[in-house]
Amino acid sequence: FILFSLIPLSSYFFNVWMPYQKIALKVENTEFTRKDLVEFIRFNQRLSEEQGNQFDLGSSLFQSLQLLAENEIAFLYATEFGLTVDEWEIDEAFFLKLGLYNNFNLESEEDEEVFKERKIQFLNQIQIDENKFKEIIRKSLFREKLRRELSREIPTLQQHKYIYEIALEDISTSNLNKIQKEITATSNISDIVKKYSIDPEVMRGAGDFGWIPKGAKPDLDYLFFSENNQALRPKELSEPFIDQENSVFKIYIISDVNESLELSEENFEIISEGILTNFFNEKSQLVDMQYGLDNETFNWINDKVQVASIFNN
């Protein structure tokens, strides 16, 4: 009888328990198992659903691994920047993520009861305990606080350039010369963009990027903001760039330069996130970080997340 009872237990151990415990990510001394990753993805998936947003399960695994690693690196460097997270901040961050912005006060007993009920419902839906839930939010807060700290050095006033984009199929020399001639002669580049761009949204403003500072479009910084007179000059067509996704070519024009404009909130956020990304890229070379992701792990985690989504919705 004992022998027969051990067989199902050993089968459960090898087929159910052990796969969950395999390491998916290691950052210094902290290990994240497949189970941790499934819970992290389900946490963010459920938050997206609560906010009424679509959640792309196909790309979520890689994004979640990267975000887990970044959160852990932020936590590792928190002391260096004097960063801490209090208990009340965890609760506040959670109800903000749920979209409870207005007329909500955690100091009110009634609102606190509503919050507790929402939290219990949320945890039951994704099947994780409160300690794990708090740890996920706590590490994400360290990431956000690090971003704010690094952003302190961003100048409020910066050089901006007014950028246009033209989508083309015909990039023959004769066509480009014709466009260049008209741009040189005009004081209203917007009309030229609308005349030649094949972007179906051009009449609704597509192709008009407006005032752009360095870092707002990092992939094109070298074109607009290179040093030593290497940057694109005003009213000069750039070389054509291939947009493979839309099967068109893109050319860029700078219409004007302002040496001191105040950063918009949107551009500040983009630049801030870029600085944080650079920080993580630099520090990831210094910390012991290992990914345990192969095809079998990828498929296993996706299957578990999909099953959890079906049964917990």
Give the positions of each predicted feature.
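Short, low-structural-confidence N-terminal segments
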Residues: 1-60, 293-313
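Alpha-helical transmembrane segments of polytopic integral membrane proteins
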Residues: 71-75, 143, 186
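Structured N-terminal alpha/beta-domain signature
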Residues: 90, 183, 190-194, 203, ...
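Charged, solvent-exposed helices and adjacent loops that form client-binding or oligomerization surfaces
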Residues: 38-61, 80-158, 170-175
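Proteostasis/folding factors centered on peptidyl-prolyl cis-trans isomerases
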Residues: 117-169, 195-197, 216-266
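A C-terminal, polar beta->alpha supersecondary segment
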Residues: 22, 107, 115, 159, ...
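Second-shell loop/turn segments in exported
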Residues: 22-30, 50-55, 59-65, 74-84, ...
